[in-house]
Amino acid sequence: KVVNRMLELGMLIDVAHCTPKARSEIYEIVGSRKNCLLASHTGAFEINRDPYNLEDWELKWFADHDCVTGIIFMNYWLSPVDSPLGLKYIEQTISHIRDVAGANVLGIGTDFDGFTDPPDEITDMSEIPRITRYLYSLKRYSDEEIEGFLGKNSIQLLMNGWGK
């Protein structure tokens, strides 16, 4: 009932804190609608098998439904390896999601709320240029892909989802 009402009102539904079962139920309710879901801060299940990370089939579903997944800046969700450094884990997640679902589903989902433990290289929003420089230095991403990740994809979702 709640999900249907949210869809009627044109609200965006965030599945970041949903269990895999709840996410599946939401995808079923959403059906063929587009621009109505996001995962505001998560990782890729194939890289780190945390149940709150999205599985590859979900990433493809996001692409088919014009949704965005924000990459969380927290190693706990991005890698099964305990490390204080995380730029490479952020990029590894970006790369995996792009390869599975395309660059249009990518967004930033830092979760800089004070309760998480971000990588030492990026501890707050003032350090976002570090990930930007890192992505450009790899020469694996186009300007359009990096700009999409840094905000254009999320803005597009907001405009298409809320702008109705």
What are the functions of these language-model segments?
Residues 1-12, 18-38, 51-67, 88-104:
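Histidine/acidic residue-rich metal-binding segments in metalloenzymes
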Residues 13, 69, 111, 146:
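Conserved, mostly hydrophobic/aromatic
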Residues 18, 42, 110-112:
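Active-site metal-binding loops of divalent metal-dependent hydrolases
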Residues 23-31, 48-54, 79-91, 112-129, ...:
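Histidine/acidic-residue-rich catalytic or RNA/ligand-binding cores of hydrolases
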Residues 66-78, 82:
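A conserved active-site cap/scaffold subdomain adjacent to cofactor or substrate pockets
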Residues 73, 101-122:
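Short acidic/histidine-rich active-site segments
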